[in-house]
Each structure stands twice: as C-alpha cells, then as structure tokens.
C-alpha cells in the first residue's frame, strides 16, 4: 500500500468509481441491448506476467463485463496482487470502466481506471459478436503502468478465459504471453 500510496483497506475492499465515457452513436458502441455484445458479457479469469521488471511472477484477476442500468457495457476488474496483508488476506487492485466495440474494426476496447491510484489501463482484443455461444477465451494487449518502484508506461499480453484452465494448458499459455524484445 505504501508503494501505491493508498490505504490497505482500499486495496482489500476497492472503491466503486465511474469511468464511463459518453460516445456518440456511430462506429463505436457501448450498448449491450443491440446485439453487439452478444456472447461477450460475463465473467472472465485473467492471466498475465508481472509488470515489475525482472520479477518472475504471474498475476491472475477477474474481469466482469455486465450491462449497467443504461444498457452500457460496464467493466469491473479485480487483480490479485499476489501479496498478503498483515492478517494474511489477499490484496487486490480494483478497477472500473467500460468495454467499447468497434463496428468497423474487429476490436473490443476495455478502458479501466482507478482514480485513487491515478491509473488507467487500456485492453484491446480481437472482437466479434457471438450468436450461438459465448466467447470462451481471448488474448489481448494491455497498455498500463508498471507496478513496482519505477511506475513507467508498460505493455503486456493478457489471457482472458471463462473456465479454469488445467496446469498443463496454463504453462503452455504462459509461453504465448511472453513479449520477446529483439
């Protein structure tokens, strides 16, 4: 909590914030009642490599995409930091925002923010509406701020999946999530 400059209580419980953009109707949509988010809404597990330089740790979280009261696609993300407080409870970072679907490009944008930490995260993933089943898995690219002492801009790959994955598949996916510098 000291590194993030927030209270431990905030990291444990989070805070509801409003990071909803107002977009004109057109080539981008946030509306869940028009079929653009069919098969997309629901809860996803996430996996990505730690953004702390030289730290060999994989982080997991949970992303919920739900329709809000105005039929916009609201996003809530809860990231398990892998750390524990003094009573042994897991410490989470919580973000809120929204998902935006492009009607012209095969891209879903998820914009997440945490006002208390002063942080925004942008997730892009391949998109299409699903008419006969739900989206099960996607790999996305994330633009965010690194954790740790430096807190510099950072990119990483993120895996989103609905159902838990067995350990063998998880290890294979970790290899695909690496970004190799050349």
Predicted feature locations:
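Short, solvent-exposed loop/hinge segments that bridge or flank secondary-structure elements
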Residues: 30-74, 160-167, 174, 178-181
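C-terminal regulatory/effector modules of DNA-binding transcriptional regulators
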Residues: 93-182
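Short glycine/proline-enriched turns and hinge-like loops at secondary-structure junctions
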Residues: 55-59, 90, 121
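Short, charged recognition helix plus adjacent turn
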Residues: 13-38
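A contiguous binding-surface segment within folded domains or other stable secondary-structure elements
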Residues: 65-113
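DNA major-groove recognition helix of helix-turn-helix/homeodomain DNA-binding modules
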Residues: 1-10
